[in-house]
């Protein structure tokens, strides 16, 4: 079980006139797929970096299972937008790298790495050099590396942002498949409305200046996809389209319509 608890969290960078985050309250329960949606500059990455332990908040706190987050830890895996792979290593050694630093023996870490590569559909590419892979395949390696340590929580920092549209759709389906199989707790950030709607079991909408959580909504679309395996049908449903229109308006600062209030 893993519960992330964020209370009154704020971050003000040195020399900044406005806080990057202020008064953020959020609780993420075990097995949830929570997506933070917002425009650039609303503090999404700052919030994720606090959860990863890369930066310390200047106010409030973040806890995992009741323990304050103070620095990076193996219980929190991170997937970056830029793949952050080691080009001189092959695929399996990239995936096993974190296990090596944890003192896991070579045979066991390679066994775990192969199992994790199979989870993301790359078991046939274990010996390939990462620079020879496409962007989508490199990001699969990044996801496998984050999963190899069996973290309680997976933190994903706009991992599809650098991919072309078709590859991005494929990766979204892969990430949902991995979540469906592992039921890892996932915190995922994006500025794509459609991506947020498709992936999230719960969506939090962030607003800038300073960054705050403005809204939180439970969504059915991730589970609909896992039940049907038909992404096109999910994304073309009237309910999905209504939500997309609603969130686009909210990101542009427009008030709720009467129809949207009824949808809530």
Curated annotation (Swiss-Prot):
Keywords linked to the UniProt accession: ATP-binding, Cell inner membrane, Cell membrane, Membrane, Nucleotide-binding, Translocase, Transport
Gene Ontology molecular-function annotations: ABC-type taurine transporter transporter activity; ATP binding; ATP hydrolysis activity
Domain of life: Bacteria
GO cellular component annotations of the record: plasma membrane
Pfam families xrefs: ABC_tran
Function (record text): Part of the ABC transporter complex TauABC involved in taurine import. Responsible for energy coupling to the transport system.
Family: Belongs to the ABC transporter superfamily. Taurine importer (TC 3.A.1.17.1) family.
Subcellular localization, as worded in the UniProt entry: Cell inner membrane
Underlying gene: tauB3
Major location (coarse): membrane
Reactions mediated catalytically: taurine(out) + ATP + H2O = taurine(in) + ADP + phosphate + H(+)
Membrane topology: Peripheral membrane protein
Subunit comment: The complex is composed of two ATP-binding proteins (TauB), two transmembrane proteins (TauC) and a solute-binding protein (TauA).
Top EC category: translocase
Gene3D superfamilies associated with the record: P-loop containing nucleotide triphosphate hydrolases
Annotated ABC transporter domain residues: 6-233
Organism, as annotated: Paraburkholderia xenovorans (strain LB400)
Residue positions binding ATP: 38-45
SUPFAM superfamilies per record: P-loop containing nucleoside triphosphate hydrolases (SSF52540)
UniProt name for this protein: Taurine import ATP-binding protein TauB 3
């Amino acid at each position: 079980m893993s519960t992330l608890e964020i209370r009154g969290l704020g971050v003000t960078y040195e020399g900044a006139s406005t806080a990057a985050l202020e008064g953020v309250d959020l609780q993420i329960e075990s097995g949830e797929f929570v997506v933070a949606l917002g425009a650039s500059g609303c503090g999404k990455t700052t919030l994720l970096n606090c959860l990863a332990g890369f930066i310390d908040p200047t106010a409030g706190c973040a806890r995992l299972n009741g323990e304050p987050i103070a620095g990076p830890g193996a219980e929190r895996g991170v997937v970056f937008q830029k793949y952050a792979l080691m080009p001189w290593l092959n695929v399996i050694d990239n995936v096993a790298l974190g296990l090596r630093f944890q003192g896991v023996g070579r045979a066991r870490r390679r066994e775990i790495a192969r199992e994790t590569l199979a989870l993301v559909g790359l078991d046939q590419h274990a010996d390939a050099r990462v620079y020879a892979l496409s962007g989508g395949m490199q990001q699969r390696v990044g996801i496998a590396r984050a999963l190899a340590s069996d973290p309680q929580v997976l933190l994903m920092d706009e991992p599809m942002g650098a991919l072309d549209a078709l590859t991005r759709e494929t990766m979204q389906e892969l990430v949902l498949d991995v979540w469906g199989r592992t039921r890892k707790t996932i915190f995922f950030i994006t500025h794509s409305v459609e991506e947020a709607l498709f992936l999230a079991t719960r969506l939090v909408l962030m607003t800038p200046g300073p960054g705050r959580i403005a809204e939180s909504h439970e969504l059915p679309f991730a589970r609909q996809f896992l039940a049907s395996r038909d992404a096109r049908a999910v994304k073309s449903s009237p309910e999905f389209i209504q939500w997309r229109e609603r969130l686009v308006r909210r990101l542009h600062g427009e008030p709720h319509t009467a129809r949207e209030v009824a949808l809530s």
